[in-house]
Regions:
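Charged, amphipathic alpha-helical regulatory modules used
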Residues: 19-126, 130
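Solvent-exposed, polar/charged alpha-helical surfaces in well-ordered, non-transmembrane soluble domains
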Residues: 34-38, 42, 58-66, 103, ...
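Conserved functional hotspot residues or short segments at active or partner-binding sites
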Residues: 60, 149, 167-182, 515-683
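Sec-dependent N-terminal signal peptides
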Residues: 4-13
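PDZ/PDZ-like domain segments forming the peptide/carboxylate-binding groove
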Residues: 66-67, 87, 98, 102-114, ...
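Polar, glycine-rich mid-to-C-terminal structural blocks
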Residues: 462, 474, 485-535
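Cleft-lining beta-strand/loop regions that shape enzyme active-site pockets
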Residues: 19, 25-28, 42-57, 192, ...
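Extended, domain-scale alpha-helical bundle/helix-rich regions
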Residues: 115-236, 242-245
Length: 683
């Protein structure tokens, strides 16, 4: 046994040497990347909020390998251990090893793809798709293989599993073979197109991500893309995308952007096909590089892009819904605050509730810097809306921050001033431990009536500051679900090549609590929210922890009494709503899908699984449609091609109305419902 291990070890030593000679990185590039790596290390050790962090160079290399081979399908455990044959004394040593390891990964991947192509070409009928074996949907938490022969054997099983999924959609062996062979060819092309900058970026970010998930290096190209997203200066759909195991996922919708306004996409949806226009053929983008998918989606203003979209819980090989979105530039006015009024009827009387929807904390910074008196901002727009609602004699206000991922920090405490007047809003701590409080010494409330802040898992950053200050001051109720949990501030600096974005501040509520990782806990939860564990700071590796510091002085308004009674009343109301059963059924289905990690390599078993899965989804959807008096779907294909906005909008409206109902409950349960007055000073 020792001889076998020793042989593997020597083989890898030989391969590393051979890789180094076959895939040389120029001395010029090695020197440049080493310099950039040194600069990044210096900046983070001196300025990052978590600058006392300590880890070994070997930890970075292991993280790098796990990043490029997270499914453990390329490197054996012995090969990973053997990197220690090269002592890492300098950044140049690390950069050199990063390229050697990547090119080992690349060459082995290309070799395995060739074996997979041979496996597919041997398939002639369903008889070749019968087996008692299985593969795993996700190998990230499993042990690595002990030998290359095990890897090769498993990769052949994987491609058969993928072929079965495609075949069950196509019902034609030759069509399925053509489709999967094209996909394998795309994988080879993607591997061959990876640049030196991207390889270096993968390695340096294996280092930066030890600090926290918001600290990362950007190549000149990725920096340009980041600025495009920030300024919305190129036409697209207004969505931030990421790639996970070859599948493009939506991680954020830009407020006011074409995708958000269409209502056809949501966070965690998967994009598996793109047609650059309505006249172009749909391109399967599974296993495409994220930058190439983005290039397909972008295009001239007012043109249409077609997307094939799958929900997060679906199988990656499902036939998705084809949607059309018109490309456009995200304009400030499209993301602006909007108002409306709704009426909540009670036996005693009708209550008029004002609604303000605030999708982001925006500000026309360019106009502000030019001292234009009419510059546009969220606080100015909300102030105007409050004046209009006050003239309508509303009984209370719901400020809807669902989906609001933040924006300008200045706007958070400008908005807080409208509701609390003078006072501290947030504490900001620097990496050196110095603390600064932000708020207003002067000013008065623009609205002193009852208020509810409505939040969800996508309410982040500035949204959490505002929700936190309303809660700490006992100014109103926070309702909905636990928020995202981003309580840090980042800074961007230029390096010799590319840029470094790093976390330099952490903010705290006036009560001393951090929103980092924990978010803001609502006073009253509304159950009509899908609990997706993939959303939130808590889902990120190495996210900074929650902690608390000393509180600072802040005023306390009259606290809303009878919170427990409000919870009970709301629970009684929502438990009888079919929406609760619908969400619970979706959640249960999603959890079962996630927990079942095995896929049989037998076409008949997989066909049965597919039928069962589609029937379950159809039952869940049609039960809810029956409750809504909507026509049920005839089959799964009709469901997939249906308009997701129909149910999504209804769910959002039900949650909003429940928030308004709770506000009216509080008005009825408390003796002084019309205005909440200033209370005593508390620390």
């Amino acid at each position: 046994m020792k001889k076998i291990v020793f042989f593997i070890f020597l083989s890898f030593i030989f391969y590393l040497s051979a890789s180094e000679s076959r895939f040389p990185i120029s001395d010029e590039n090695k020197e440049l990347y080493s310099k950039v790596y040194d600069e990044a290390q210096y900046v983070l050790k001196k300025n990052h909020f978590n600058n006392e962090l300590s880890f070994e160079k070997s930890d970075v290399v292991k993280k790098y390998i796990n990043q490029i081979d997270n499914q453990k399908l390329i490197f054996t455990q012995n090969e990973i251990n053997s990197y220690s044959i090269k002592p890492l004394f300098s950044s140049a040593d690390e950069v050199n090893l990063a390229f050697i390891l990547f090119n080992f990964f690349k060459e082995r991947s290309l070799n395995l793809i060739d074996h997979q192509i041979n496996t597919i070409q041997l398939i002639e009928s369903e008889e070749d798709l019968i087996s008692n074996d299985f593969v795993y949907k996700d190998r990230e938490n499993l042990e690595r293989f002990k030998s290359y022969s095990q890897i090769k054997s498993y990769q052949q099983k994987l491609i058969k599993s993928e072929f079965i999924s495609i075949y069950l959609k196509e019902n034609d062996i030759e069509k399925a073979k053509k489709k999967i062979l094209k996909r394998l060819d795309n994988r080879k092309k993607s591997l061959n197109r990876i640049s030196n900058d991207e390889i270096f970026s993968l390695y340096i970010n294996s280092y930066t991500n030890f600090y926290d998930p918001h600290t990362n290096y950007m190549t000149p190209t990725s920096q340009e893309d980041w600025e495009i997203n920030l300024k919305a200066s190129l036409e697209g759909i207004g969505a931030i995308l990421s790639s996970e195991d070859g599948i493009t996922k939506i991680i954020r919708l830009i407020p006011g952007g074409p995708a958000e306004k269409s209502g056809l996409l949501k966070v965690t949806d998967k994009i598996v096909g793109v047609a650059t226009s309505i006249n172009e053929e749909l391109v399967d983008v599974r296993d495409w590089r994220i930058d190439e998918v983005v290039k397909l989606i972008r295009g001239p203003k007012s043109t249409i892009v077609q997307l094939e979209v799958l929900p997060a819980s679906s199988d990656n090989e499902d036939k998705g819904k084809l949607i059309e979105i018109t490309r456009d530039v995200v304009k400030l006015e499209d993301a602006a605050a909007k108002k409306r009024e709704i009426t909540i009827q009670r036996s005693s009387r009708d209550y008029k509730i004002g609604i303000i929807e605030l999708p982001t904390f925006y500000m026309d910074f360019e106009a502000y810097n030019k001292n234009r008196f009419d510059y546009k901002s969220s606080s100015r727009d909300v102030k105007r809306i409050l004046r209009e609602l006050d003239e309508s004699n509303i009984d209370g206000l719901v400020l809807d921050l669902r989906g609001n991922g933040g924006g300008f920090l200045f706007e958070a405490y400008s908005l807080a001033k409208l509701f609390i007047g003078r006072g501290n809003v947030v504490q900001v701590m620097e990496s050196n431990g110095s603390l600064q409080s932000l708020g207003h010494n002067l000013g008065k409330q623009n609205y002193d009536g009852p208020i509810v802040i409505l939040v969800d898992k996508l309410s982040a950053s500035a949204s959490e500051i505002l929700a936190g200050v309303i809660q700490d001051y006992d100014r109103g109720l926070v309702i909905g679900s636990q928020t995202f949990g981003k309580g840090t501030v980042q800074r961007m600096i230029e390096l010799s090549h590319g840029h470094l974005k790093f976390t330099e501040q952490k903010y705290y509520r006036v009560s001393g609590e951090s929103t980092q990782n924990k978010g803001v806990e609502p006073d009253i939860s509304i159950p009509f929210v899908f609990n997706d564990e993939e959303i939130g700071e808590r889902s990120y590796e190495n996210s900074l922890p929650y902690n608390f510091i000393d509180p600072i002085f802040y005023r306390s308004f009259n606290k809303v009494e009878n919170i427990e009674l409000l919870k009970t009343t709301s629970s009684n109301r929502t438990s009888s709503n079919e929406m609760s059963a619908y969400i619970e059924a979706q959640q249960e289905f999603y959890e079962n899908e996630k927990n079942n990690n095995e896929l049989p390599l037998d076409v008949e078993k997989r066909r049965f699984m597919k039928i069962q899965r589609e029937e379950k989804i159809l039952t869940i959807e049609n039960n809810f449609r029956s409750y809504l008096s909507l026509v049920p779907f005839q089959d799964y294909e009709e469901f997939v091609s249906s308009d997701p906005e129909e149910i999504s909008d209804l769910r959002e409206e039900i949650v909003l109305r429940e928030a308004a109902e709770i506000l009216v409950d509080s008005l009825q349960f408390n003796e002084t419902p019309s205005r909440l007055s200033f209370g005593i000073l508390s620390q």
